[in-house]
Amino acid sequence: MGFWCRMLENQEQEEVITVRVQDPRVQNEGSWNSYVDYKIFLHTNSKAFTAKTSCVRRRYREFVWLRKQLQRNAGLVPVPELPGKSTFFGSSDEFIEKRRQGLQHFLEKVLQSVVLLSDSQLHLFLQSQLSVPEIEACVQGRSPVSVSDAILRYAMSNCGWAQEERRGSSHLAEGDQPKSCCFLPRPGRRSSPSPPPGEEKDPFEVWAPVVDSEAPPLESPTLPPTSSPSCCGFARPDEGLSASQPVRRVLGGGHAVPLDPGQLETVLEK
């Protein structure tokens, strides 16, 4: 009887999709092509996703492309709006924070639509670090790896660093957690994500992204290997979704420091 009860509970388990847009950073700070990007962390138990946990960085321009593609493929199904390009806010920091909140609201609405959720471009946008041309090549059959394989390859590329990160984890105080869902890549090493916030793990236990082998394949032929591992930044696990996210600039070696609001004027619209 207990066995059948457990089966019934599993069948009735509610699907949950959690998405967070956070940690805005100015990339290529000081150059003509500087821009702001955002970390997108996704954790789910839905069978619609190949990887149950993922972490990528995307810029506003890529969100604009994604919305156009979703609208093109969705037909009469409405696609949520993106935050506008208006700069009528009190400061540059406030503008970026408003945009971050708007981008998160956009993704939350998109992920509530069954039609939009079936678009393979959305999955590659959220669960791989492929560029826009690489995503287009993948869904159009002009690359050698399938959509699901591309997502799996990106997920598995974040499983390294086990030996290196054990030492760092052992020095954390009780209750502390690593400060990122995706570690910045180090030369010669692959990056490794941390367990989802709030989930207690043995600091010496190797954690890897959960992959659903029974997830329905996303219909699309293939793409080339990902050009680079995850570049998700260091975000504190206690950063709330509504809390203001400090803007950072990326310097040599993968470190980040707060950015003077006056330096953001040339990168807000990119």
Swiss-Prot record:
**Similarity-based family:** Belongs to the sorting nexin family.
- Record's Pfam families? PX
Protein transport among keywords: yes
Residues annotated as signal peptide: none
| Membrane-topology annotation of the record | Peripheral membrane protein
Q: What does this protein do?
A: Phosphoinositide-binding protein involved in protein sorting and membrane trafficking in endosomes. Regulates the levels of TRPV3 by promoting its trafficking from the cell membrane to lysosome for degradation.
Q: What quaternary structure, including any partners, is listed in this protein's UniProt entry?
A: Monomer. Interacts with TRPV3; this interaction promotes TRPV3 trafficking from the cell membrane to lysosome for degradation.
The question of whether GTP-binding is a record keyword is answered with: no
Q: CDD domains from the entry?
A: PX_SNX10
Q: Which GO terms describe its cellular component?
A: cytoplasm; endosome; plasma membrane
Question: Major place of localization?
Answer: membrane
Region (Important for membrane trafficking) residue spans: 135-139
Could you tell me which residue ranges the PX domain spans?
16-132
Q: Show the segment(s) annotated as Disordered.
A: 168-244, 251-270
Q: Where does a 1,2-diacyl-sn-glycero-3-phospho-(1D-myo-inositol-3-phosphate) bind?
A: R59, K85, R99
Domain of life, source organism? Eukaryota
Encoded by which gene? SNX11
Q: What is this protein called?
A: Sorting nexin-11
Annotated Basic and acidic residues bias: 168-177
Q: Which InterPro entries match?
A: PX_dom (IPR001683), PX_dom_sf (IPR036871), SNX10/11 (IPR043544)
* GO MF, one example: phosphatidylinositol phosphate binding
Please quote what the entry notes about the protein's domains. The PX domain mediates interaction with membranes enriched in phosphatidylinositol 3-phosphate.
Alphabetically ordered keywords of this record:
Cell membrane, Cytoplasm, Endosome, Lipid-binding, Membrane, Protein transport, Transport
Q: Where is the composition biased (Pro residues)?
A: 218-227
